[in-house]
Amino acid sequence: MPKMKTKKSLAKRVTVKSNGTLKRAKAYRSHRATGKTTKQKRQLSKATIISKVDMKNLKGLLQ
């Protein structure tokens, strides 16, 4: 049976941390930010951890 290929689109969007969790960037930050407050923009600039529910499906795509 051949090896599973890594989904490159996902691999470019997430990073795997040392404990195995996946880290991603938040959306709604790239443009049209004038209507957002400074607090919103600051919080959107930080990375976040992918939930455990989604992690199971996404780890299979990164194999």
UniProtKB/Swiss-Prot annotation:
Recorded GO terms, molecular function?
structural constituent of ribosome
**What are the protein's UniProt keywords?**
Ribonucleoprotein, Ribosomal protein
Region (Disordered), start-end ranges? 24-44
Instruction: Give a GO biological-process term.
Output: translation
Ribonucleoprotein as a keyword of this entry, yes or no, is: yes
For the keyword Ribosomal protein, the answer is yes
User: Do you know which SUPFAM superfamilies this protein is assigned to?
Assistant: L35p-like
Might you report a single GO cellular component term? cytosolic large ribosomal subunit
Q: Please indicate which superkingdom the organism of origin belongs to.
A: Bacteria
Concerning Pfam families, the annotation shows:
Ribosomal_L35p
Q: Which family does it belong to?
A: Belongs to the bacterial ribosomal protein bL35 family.
HAMAP family annotated for this entry?
Ribosomal_bL35
Spell out the protein name for this chain: Large ribosomal subunit protein bL35
Which organism was this protein described from? Mycoplasma mycoides subsp. mycoides SC (strain CCUG 32753 / NCTC 10114 / PG1)
Taxonomy of the source species: Bacteria, Bacillati, Mycoplasmatota, Mollicutes, Mycoplasmataceae
